[in-house]
Amino acid sequence: MDMGNQHPSISRLQEIQREVKSIEQQVVGFSGLSDDKNYKRLERILTKQLFEIDSVDTEGKGDIQQARKRAAQDTERLLKELEQNANHPHRIEIKNIFQEAQALVKEKTVPFYSGSNCVTSEFEEAIQDIILRLTHVKTGGKISLRKARYHTLTKICAVQEIIEDCVRKQPSLPLSEDVHPSVAKINSVMCEVNKARGTLIALLMGVDSSETCRHLSCVLSGLMADLDALDVCGRTEIRNYRREVVEDINKLLKYLDLEEEADNTHAFDLGQNHSIIKIENVLKRMREMKNELLQAQSPPELYLRSKTELQGLIGQLDEVSLEKNPCIREARRRAVIEVQTLITYLDLKEALEKRKLFPCEETPPHKAVWNVLGNLSEIQGEVLSFGGNRTDKNYIRLEELLTKQLLTLDAVDPLGEEKCKAARKQAVKLAQNILSYLDMKSDEWEY
């Protein structure tokens, strides 16, 4: 159709659709909640467009009616997606976990920086547990959920780093102000930096509405300028003291960029992350080797070569950069367990083959332990091949088989024989590790 002859109502509908299209990515990637300002802004824009669409006169013409219907459906679809993003059960789960972290920080951390409390090991364990729970929140590959999870993780992990750095660091004692007049100023700045830590933590966790990131950045930059202007008269000890305080300020300043970092696509879309890609490449090769070993007619011939390569894969995983990202850390941890489990499987197979080739006299209890190890080897092969979840009948069957082997080992009386005791202990540990591995494989974790 000639654009110059296009009906004004069609032109208006196309204009509205372009306006709606321009905010589509903002809606798809919206990671907040329904009480956020940005939610209300997007909702207001889309609702306004719906009214605009409804006001277009179709003049009873079928083509205009169809165009208006399509425009309304597109806009309503985005409104629905916006609402679903903000109210998704896993988004609410992220919110609830974050609120737990807020309560913990408000109670334990902020008072620490005012000198009325201290950071305990219980707090550190609690914050680590919160981080682990966040990494296990399912996103289903949904951009808004990945973004919300990563956004929340960056804040809580930043608090964890600030606390750990402060607790771990053994700072130099403030120099005596008698040493040089500039020392008094450095001591004063150091006190302000300590206060700024508490303010920063409160800001990151949203437990202090009286401060802003911009103002705190100005305060820290001002303290930095004050230190730069000091004349230390070439005194090495004063220069080193000043440098320590400057480094502390720089560490705090980097956390003020977290909002921007959390909006970076490559930060939350871990499928594109180079560390995750490395981990996936290792896992791909490990799975190829696993399939080859489980299907091999003469596996003993593959043992040495396979174990050497698997150890090399462990080395590759050790070199993966964690980027201070708990999701990457968890992905690497699980990959290491995957590879180590296959190595353990090969070690047990080798031991069982060696026992067949070089039989020796064994006591009945020791022989009973070896029988269990033989059973565990067969079960472990099945567990390595397992790819379901915890509701699968096969999962329940494997879990029952492993529990049965543990009960059998519990019934073995080593009769005081140390060698048998050690073998039974090792077999129990192996059975428990296989159970843990089965649980890990079936928990449907994703990054």
From Swiss-Prot:
Keyword Repeat assigned? yes
Q: Which GO terms describe its biological process?
A: Golgi organization; negative regulation of neuron projection development; negative regulation of oxidative stress-induced intrinsic apoptotic signaling pathway; negative regulation of proteasomal ubiquitin-dependent protein catabolic process; negative regulation of protein refolding; negative regulation of protein ubiquitination; protein stabilization; regulation of inclusion body assembly
Keyword set for this entry? Chaperone, Repeat
Q: What would be one Pfam family of this protein?
A: BAG
The protein's matches in InterPro entries, at most eight in alphabetical order, are given as: BAG_chaperone_regulator (IPR039773), BAG_dom_sf (IPR036533), BAG_domain (IPR003103)
Origin: domain of life: Eukaryota
Q: Where is the BAG domain?
A: 9-86, 95-167, 182-260, 275-350, 365-442
Q: In which tissues is it expressed?
A: Detected in brain, lung, stomach, liver, kidney and testis.
> Its Gene Ontology molecular function terms?
adenyl-nucleotide exchange factor activity; protein kinase binding; protein-folding chaperone binding; ubiquitin ligase inhibitor activity; ubiquitin protein ligase binding
Q: Which GO terms describe its cellular component?
A: cytoplasm; cytosol; inclusion body; junctional membrane complex; membrane; mitochondrion; nucleus; perinuclear region of cytoplasm
Its annotated function is as follows: Co-chaperone for HSP/HSP70 proteins. It functions as a nucleotide-exchange factor promoting the release of ADP from HSP70, thereby activating HSP70-mediated protein refolding. Has an essential role in maintaining proteostasis at junctional membrane complexes (JMC), where it may function as a scaffold between the HSPA8 chaperone and JMC proteins enabling correct, HSPA8-dependent JMC protein folding. Inhibits both auto-ubiquitination of PRKN and ubiquitination of target proteins by PRKN.
Subunit text? Binds to the ATPase domain of HSP/HSP70 chaperones. Binds PRKN. Interacts with HSPA8 and JPH2.
| Name of this chain's protein | BAG family molecular chaperone regulator 5
Q: Which organism is it from?
A: Rattus norvegicus (Rat)
What lineage is on file? Eukaryota, Metazoa, Chordata, Craniata, Vertebrata
